[in-house]
Amino acid sequence: MKSSRDEAVGHHSISSFEVMLSALFIMLMVFSIGLIAVSWLAVKESEGDAALGKSHEVRGTFKITSGVTYNPNLQDKHSVDFKVLAFDLQQMIDEIFESSSLKNEYEKSKVFQFEKGSVIVLFDLFFAQWVSDKNVKEELIQGIEANISSQLVTLHIDLNSIDITASLSDFTTAVPVTTSDKLTTSSPMTTSASLGNLSTTVAATTSAPLCNLSTATFATTSGHVSIECQPGSRPCAHAWNCVATDLFCDGEVNCPDGSDEDTGLCATACDGRFLLTGDSGVFQADRYPRPDESGVVCRWIIRVNQGLSIRMNFGSFIPHYTDVLDIYEGIGPSKILRGSFWETDPGTIRIFSNLVTVTFLIKSDEYDYIGFNATYSTFNNSELNNYEKIDCTFDDGFCFWTQDLDDDNEWERIQVTTFPCYTGPRFDHTYGNGSGFYISTPTEQGWRSERVGLSSLSLDLTSEPVCLHFWYYMCCENVYNLNIHISSAETTDKIVFQRKGNYGRNWNYGQVTLNETGEFKVVFNAFRNRGCSTIALDDISLTNGICSQSPYPEPTLVPTPPPELPTDCGGPFELWEPNSTFSSPNFPDKYPNQASCIWNLNAQRGKNIQLHFQEFDLENINDVVEVRDGGEFDSLLLAVYTGPGPVKDLFSTTNRMTVIFTTNMETRRKGFKANFTSGYYLGIPEPCQDDEFQCKDGNCIPLGNLCDSYPHCRDGSDEASCVRFLNGTRSNNGLVQFNIHSIWHIACAENWTTQISNEVCHLLGLGSANSSMPISSTGGGPFVRVNQAPNGSLILTPSLQCSQDSLILLQCNHKSCGEKKVTQKVSPKIVGGSDAQAGAWPWVVALYHRDRSTDRLLCGASLVSSDWLVSAAHCVYRRNLDPTRWTAVLGLHMQSNLTSPQVVRRVVDQIVINPHYDRRRKVNDIAMMHLEFKVNYTDYIQPICLPEENQIFIPGRTCSIAGWGYDKINAGSTVDVLKEADVPLISNEKCQQQLPEYNITESMICAGYEEGGIDSCQGDSGGPLMCQENNRWFLVGVTSFGVQCALPNHPGVYVRVSQFIEWIHSFLH
């Protein structure tokens, strides 16, 4: 029997309609969740894309309104008109950005099109990392407004027409992750543990990062785990690691599971290959790109057995001009770029390593270019004999010769003379037609002096001499120097062959006998100046035995065309009033190069001279007018003028003035026109009354205001010399004298305190007081009683005598100086020498000079106080009119690390050349440089001590030198790391014997070894010669001059600082 309760809890059967509704509800729920998930992924993807996108290339345009005229040839990229204008504009753009705040990011520019409308220029700019379009545009406008480039003298660019936009190749899109980073349409970002299907979002850039994956999901036994990596890195496939994107597919394993070098991941789109092993193989970029493959980077790693080297042959090489092939020695981040090729066939490339990286950047989207086909094979350079290492016609690449990585530019392998200079050989020497190759210094116009080096492999010791044969070409007006030197462990760069000058458009034969006692390398060095010139080499070979007499006549230099005007002005000219107007030769037309002119201006005895330049326009720095007070050989330096005018009037203190005009071999300008007048006290202030003091600037103040602790003179000269030791000695002890109304009073001992001692020592520019003691007076006054006011100032009371005839004898400590906070044992030498440790020489200063928007290290200096440097006068001669172009870098160790926290930069605001400096006789070569702001002393910045006046440093004593100058003769550039050396002092008599061509005076001191090898060199000028006494270092000399660098029996010559102590102290106190 059933109750009603039992019926209530029974099961109700579900109808088909209810089943349909339930299924529909579940489907809607799944669909909604899917929509939410897809939307979330899309948002995250767009956020990731925005965070990871980088722009390395921008496209720009501007309009040239004057200075160039449009013509149809500008539409033809192969025409001379197009190439010339594109070359000039690229140089202009490069100069602007290389002097801008983007100079570290900027790489290069490419002008690719001109359009009509005056002349509209379209160009691409390439940067190493992302920069904003706005920033690029602002820097370009500022550079044009500032006339940074010389091209802007003739070209006028409409600033309103400048437009910068991101290049289409820089937009971030989703692509497969392979070494071929190509641009495709956007797709959802997915990551699988299967490397072959791995995909991510990347940006194709000039630096070719392989991918920028920030998130990956992996299947595990417990489910899916997501790994998130920082921008610029991506996860490994089967490990909990993130690795920098640019470390993927670089030949070195960085992921624990090796997935960053997986051949499936890294296979190129060019040919499907990545890792090439075995003794031979092929790789290619054939018939590229397909329409969907612009912006591709292909990379191959070649790895062969240890001990072998790699030879690559390029059977064909026909890329688009924007596409670049780079070949590196080695793999990973430490690989070394050995060659970049675009448009020019690489031929045969040999890399002396078993590891090679090859990258091919395809930026074009045109399908008409074939690309390249290459093969590689191995060789063992240890099996080569000396003749195989040397012999080369350059038809088989560079054979076994290598480019010098430490030089300033690279040799180019070419066939015929090339644009834009056309100064090279018409054909090679081997065949004498267009089928052969030779190597040449860079074919473009040089913008600086530079060295280009070529080195052989190490040659084995031979039992007999060998003869090196070669053909060389040196042309044209701006060509400089070709030399061959021998480099070995036993020899310091021995020069065995050298030619200088223009030998015309001819191949010339050269030979030299080599007879070395150990392994050695042969190095060709070509030096070229600014402008167009070519040095070329071909047909280098080696034969047994001493060189026989050359079968070819000795080449002769092309005669230098005579100057349009005589360089000798015919003087010296003696000028008297009324014949008081004179000018540079040929004024107002251009003066001649290499001119040397002297005018002696004369006035009646008792009068002086005022010199006025009515017009003045010289080439800056290279051409100068020097004005001296007095006769030519017994005068003081008044001024050195250069560059465009106007310049200030000058006044002599005697009745004679000397004007010297010299020019160099480069640019000629209009010159100058000047006149002079004579009179009494011209430019000299009226003398003051008897009860007045005359300031240095000529103004007069009441005598009562002298030495009252308040500067009444605008130049502060009334408070400059108010206390001294008796008779003005520069020692640190003695009786104290005070200047009261221009009369020196001796201080009494009465009421003298320790506080007064410290204050007096401070006023004397010394350290704290060491001791003071009363002594009995032995002479007449006048005297002064000294008391101290509550505010610390001194109260001076003149007196006829002192209490108990007691005077004060004070001794002050020297200021802290010459103390190293970081010690180091001095190593062998500067030329070819040893690196100093950071902080080893904290008073050594690097002087950089800005010329044409480039800062270049020219000289050294020594810090002698918190705001004064001592350097050489010849460093700042010609470069003294605008002191702010000089920057002093203190605490510097490496030039490549100017941003080190130990480094302090200060602008120079005043330069004072010693008035006795004579550039022609090289005497009194010393100058003072004032820093705009004082520096604080640290472990890396300290002052050096100054010697006592006329202090003697005995010959034979070992002292030290330091600097960033050349470490090799003809090195061509300064070194990166500060060098140091020990050198012995030698007597002036011995120095005069070894340097008979110079007059070694008492204001000079010499140092060096008889055998040479250790010396200061170019770039060290102005730096210190330092000797140590009582654990403190003293500035004994200032690097001045020498004959080349480190030659035997040719010591370095330095300014003897002890002869200039009074002059130096006049600036410090």
Curated annotation (Swiss-Prot):
Protein name from the UniProt record: Enteropeptidase
Gene name of this polypeptide: Tmprss15
GO CC annotation: membrane
A single GO BP: proteolysis
Active-site residues, as the UniProt record annotates them: H874, D925, S1021
Chemical reaction(s) catalysed: Activation of trypsinogen by selective cleavage of 6-Lys-|-Ile-7 bond
Enzyme Commission number(s) of this protein: 3.4.21.9
Primary location recorded for the protein, binned into one broad class: membrane
GO molecular function, one term: serine-type endopeptidase activity
Limits of the Peptidase S1 domain: 830-1069
Gene3D superfamilies to which the protein is assigned, alphabetical: 2.60.120.200, Low-density Lipoprotein Receptor, SEA domain, Spermadhesin, CUB domain, SRCR-like domain, Trypsin-like serine proteases
Segments crossing the lipid bilayer: 19-47
Residue ranges of every copy of the SEA domain listed in the record: 54-169
